[in-house]
Regions:
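Catalytic domains of carbohydrate-active enzymes, especially glycoside hydrolases
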Residues: 1-10, 220-226
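Glycine-rich, proline-tolerant flexible connector loops at the mouths of alpha/beta enzymes
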Residues: 9-23
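Active-site region of glycoside hydrolase catalytic domains
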Residues: 17-19, 32-234
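Charged helix-capping and loop-helix junction motifs
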Residues: 24-30
Length: 234
């Protein structure tokens, strides 16, 4: 018996450019049919609002999530989803595998890899910060709209092993896991950056645009649960 169905809304299916005032009606009808069928079968809905579907226009025109403007574009999309289907959803994920912004920036945050090198930490973590703020503001919006359901954070988990039993190898493993896996949920659940990220930012010359309003919204609108995907044991 299927009790819960998790599925994702494609931002670009509803708003192909990402900044339209009105949604694509064919996309709306498509999702209406899914919600209707699940409710008819008595199946609870676990909805992911953004699953690697940053509209290409926003990637190419403003640089994806490294631009603060993305927060407002995302919230316009989120407001439509909440108003259209909010009363039918039991569990919410504003962002799928949010730590993908670190290990796969193009998929996670719509960052295009520079042609002359690799991604730079300044852009990667700035983009993640703006997603954290958008996540918190989505929860704030849902509370103002009296939307039922609970909101969670989600990361992609990997299984790492130290090279040897030596303390230095185990410590290196812990530090890598902190950045790769845990810090995103730490921010979304606790409402602030953990101590180890401050050290990491200083060491890597990362200076984020974080406003007082950002800090307040992160602290006030944290997630209700932690979730993760886990595809393999090694």
């Amino acid at each position: 018996v299927l009790d819960v169905s998790r599925f994702s809304i494609s931002w670009s299916r509803l708003f192909p450019l990402g900044n339209e005032e009105q949604p694509n009606e064919q996309g709306v009808a498509y999702y209406d049919s899914i919600f209707r069928e699940l409710k008819k079968k008595g199946i609870k809905i676990f909805l992911t609002m953004n699953h690697y579907a940053v509209p290409l226009y926003l990637v190419e025109s403003i640089g994806g999530w490294k631009n603060r403007e993305m927060i407002d574009h995302y919230l316009s999309f989120a407001e439509f989803v909440l108003s259209r289907w909010g009363n039918q959803v039991d569990f919410w994920l504003p962002f799928n595998e949010i730590n993908a912004g670190f290990f796969s920036p193009y998929n996670g945050t719509g960052l295009i890899k520079p042609s002359n090198g690799d991604y730079i930490y300044q852009d990667v973590f700035q983009a993640l910060h703006y997603q954290f703020v958008a996540n918190a503001k989505t929860i704030q919006l849902a509370r103002k709209m009296d939307i039922p359901g609970i909101f969670g954070s989600m990361v992609s988990c990997f299984c790492y092993y130290p090279l040897t039993p030596k303390p230095e190898d185990n410590l290196k493993l812990v530090k890598e896991e902190q950045i790769n896996q845990w810090f995103c949920s730490d921010v979304l659940m606790q409402g602030e950056y953990p101590y180890y990220m401050h050290s990491f930012f200083e060491k890597n010359s990362v200076d984020l645009d974080i406003t007082a309003e950002d800090r307040q919204i992160l602290k006030e609108y944290t997630c209700d649960f932690v979730s993760f995907s886990y595809y393999s044991s090694s």
